[in-house]
Structure formats: C-alpha cells, structure tokens
Amino acid sequence: MKVRSIGFTINNNNKNINTVDVMNAFINASNREHSRTDYTRKILISDVNDFYYGLVVTFRNQKKNCKSQFVDGKFQLKIEDLQGSDKLANFNFFLIKKSNLSGLYMYHHGSCSLNTLFSHLETISNEFIRNQNKEEIKKLGDKPKQKEVTAINKKYKERLTFSLMTNKNNIQSVLCQF
C-alpha cells in the first residue's frame, strides 16, 4: 500500500471566531458518526502538547472482500464473505500544529480523501459558528432591531478555510516547519 503525506492548512481570518474554541468543537465532535449509504466514518481528534492528533476511521458497508495470492506461481483471486457485523475498515492519520494550524494527512488509495475530511470539519465548524451567532442574537432580547441582527450576522460571515498546502521546497524544508 502506497501512503502519501499531504500538507494542509486551516486558516481563520475572522477575529470574532476563537480558533481554539473551534478546535475544541472538533474534539467534542469525536463521538459523532458520519453515516452514508456505503460507509460510516468517525473522526477522532485529541489535543496533546503542541499538536492536535487525528484518526479517521471508515467502516465500509460491504459484505464481500477480495483476497489475492500466488499459489504454485499462479495468481488466484478469492472472494470472501464477511460474517455478521464484520466490516472492512480504512484508517487515515493526521496531525495539526497548534501554532500555525499547518497539518500533515496520511492518505492511501481508497481511503477518506483530504477534501472529504475538510467537508466534515467545515460542517462542524459552521455548526459551532452558527450557534455562536445565534447566542449573540439571543442576547439582544425578544425583538432585536434588524440592523443589530445584520451586524452580528456580518460579524460571523467569514468562516474557517481549509486548503491543501502547495510548496516547491524539498521535503526536508517542509518538515522543518513542524
């Protein structure tokens, strides 16, 4: 299995959103299951010293698995039935440096893509920010002025961005950033 390391960054250009609070929302969402038709996924994140560590576990909803082997110099393919609640699992690991929110994601073919991880994290961060926005509007009272509501909505309009890190430097200089 060929594993690729992909660099990424998380940016927060909105001074009204506390990055640490959003990262804590990611950690608190670690018990959440992301269920789709063909898989269930969990994104587990922890906070240790200078880094956030993450594990993406994807459980495939399939009942067959292909095994291949060479027997007497001949290639054989065997289809194996999974039993009961057995599921195939894929794992991805990542880490994010707290000081600059730069990360490294370990990807292999057929596993959760980095863009899919970004989508899950974006959903969680947007939920957190919308709740923060709603709480601030609630503090205005029962009948807030539309101008005040619009100002609060504008305050939280800019959200976190997630992007691939592209860099022409060699791997040694990239790793020195961590």
Go through each PLM region and give its residues.
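Terminal interaction module
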Residues: 1-72, 112-115, 119-178
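Long, hydrophobic/aromatic-enriched structural stretches that serve as scaffold segments
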Residues: 55-115
